[in-house]
């Protein structure tokens, strides 16, 4: 058909001829592996005090999303059995490792909810020691480092008490209807949170080195 063999748009076509960008062609010719948010995302130059974190669960959600370790995608783990919702954005810190085999958990205080799978810069302000069904499951309490309403906070003692009580009550109650017991201890200051993150970074590094030796 006239116009097709010479690469021009047919007469009467509403669309211009497609221009094939060399960068697009080169990207199509290569095999790509999707980046894994736990292992491929940098923790950030300011870590352990200021760090990147990946949000799994947005504030106000009743759905518990979590990282699927095999694929690096965010999957639906379950819908909470009770009527409570996550009080703040919740996720994990990349390139960290805890004794339970998971990355370090973090709860990020900020003005808005954000979508699962995005990452943001956070500042550690405290540590919430927690025991989940007899196992240690501590949470870092942080603020969004790029939120003008929260970025000035440096320690958990600066957060209004009712906010901390809201966080405590959520984690104490969100598994009750599943007949699972969770105990939350007293909040600890920013120094303890930073030390916990540093330890999890070291543990991750040691694990990677050990894996390379095998």
From Swiss-Prot:
Annotated substrate binding sites: 64, 78, 90, 174
Cofactors named for this entry: Mg(2+)
EC number: 3.6.1.1
Cellular component GO terms held in the UniProt record: cytoplasm
Location(s) in or outside the cell: Cytoplasm
Signal peptide positions on this chain: none
Alphabetical GO biological process terms: phosphate-containing compound metabolic process
Entry keyword set: Cytoplasm, Hydrolase, Magnesium, Metal-binding
GO MF annotation, one: inorganic diphosphate phosphatase activity
InterPro entries with a match to the protein in the record: Pyrophosphatase, Pyrophosphatase_sf
Protein residues bound to Mg(2+) 1: 100, 105, 137
Keyword Metal-binding set for record: yes
Binding site for Mg(2+) 2: 105
Catalytic activity: diphosphate + H2O = 2 phosphate + H(+)
Predominant subcellular localization, coarse grouping: cytoplasm
A family per Pfam: Pyrophosphatase
Enzyme class name: hydrolase
Protein family membership: Belongs to the PPase family.
Protein name from the UniProt record: Soluble inorganic pyrophosphatase
Gene this chain is encoded by: IPP
């Amino acid at each position: 058909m006239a116009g097709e063999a010479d690469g021009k748009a047919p007469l009467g076509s509403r669309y211009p001829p497609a221009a094939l960008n060399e960068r697009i062609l080169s990207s199509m010719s290569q095999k790509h592996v999707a980046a894994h948010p736990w292992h491929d995302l940098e923790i950030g130059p300011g870590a352990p005090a200021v760090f990147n974190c990946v949000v799994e669960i947005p504030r106000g959600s009743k759905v518990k999303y979590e990282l699927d370790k095999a694929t690096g995608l965010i999957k639906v783990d379950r819908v909470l059995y009770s009527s409570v919702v996550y009080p703040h954005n919740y996720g994990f810190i990349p390139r960290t490792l805890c004794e339970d085999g998971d990355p370090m958990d973090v709860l990020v205080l900020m003005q808005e909810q954000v979508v699962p799978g995005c990452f943001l810069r956070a500042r550690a302000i405290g540590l919430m020691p927690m025991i989940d069904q007899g196992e240690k499951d501590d949470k870092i309490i942080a603020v969004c480092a790029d939120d003008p309403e929260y970025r000035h906070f440096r320690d958990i003692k600066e957060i209004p008490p009712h906010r901390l009580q809201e966080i405590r009550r959520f984690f104490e109650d969100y598994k009750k209807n599943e007949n699972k017991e969770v105990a939350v201890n007293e909040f600890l200051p920013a120094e303890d949170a930073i030390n916990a993150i540093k330890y999890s970074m070291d543990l991750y590094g040691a694990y990677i080195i050990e894996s390379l030796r095998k």
